[in-house]
């Protein structure tokens, strides 16, 4: 069965680029522009993985993630300390922390590992 991924990022270029990359890998990909948009689409889309930027306008990500029942991997453009990463990874459904800018091959490798 084909896995579905939701990309949640307020940057249209990031959403578009990651969507194209993952679709070429055979995944079904849907997008959301922020946490609120993500929450409104979750019931309908039922993704196997949510790739979510940690810095977006709207409801803070730390309040959105607990409402997501599926696996979540954070995408971060900001430099974060190990303590900050540990804090972000506290939610039981958070499975990875991917630093932006990311290497395309590494992103694909991480996604495949998470969804294996």
Show where each model-derived region lies:
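Helix N-cap/capping motif at the beta->alpha junctions
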Residues: 31-40, 61
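Alpha4 helix (beta4-alpha4-beta5 surface) of REC/receiver domains from two-component response regulators
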Residues: 62-63, 79-98, 105, 109
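Hydrophobic/aromatic residues positioned on beta-strands within the core alpha/beta folds
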Residues: 75-77
């Amino acid at each position: 069965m084909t896995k579905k991924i939701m990309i949640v990022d307020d940057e249209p270029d990031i959403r578009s680029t990651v969507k194209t990359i993952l679709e070429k890998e055979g995944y079904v990909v849907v997008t959301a522009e922020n946490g609120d948009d993500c929450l409104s689409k979750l019931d309908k889309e039922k993704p196997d993985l949510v790739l979510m930027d940690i810095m977006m306008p709207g409801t803070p990500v730390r309040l959105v993630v607990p409402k997501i029942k599926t696996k979540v991997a954070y995408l971060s453009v900001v430099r974060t300390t190990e303590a900050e990463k540990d804090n972000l990874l506290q939610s039981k459904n958070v499975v990875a922390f991917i630093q932006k800018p990311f290497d395309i091959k590494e992103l694909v490798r991480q996604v495949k590992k998470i969804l294996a």
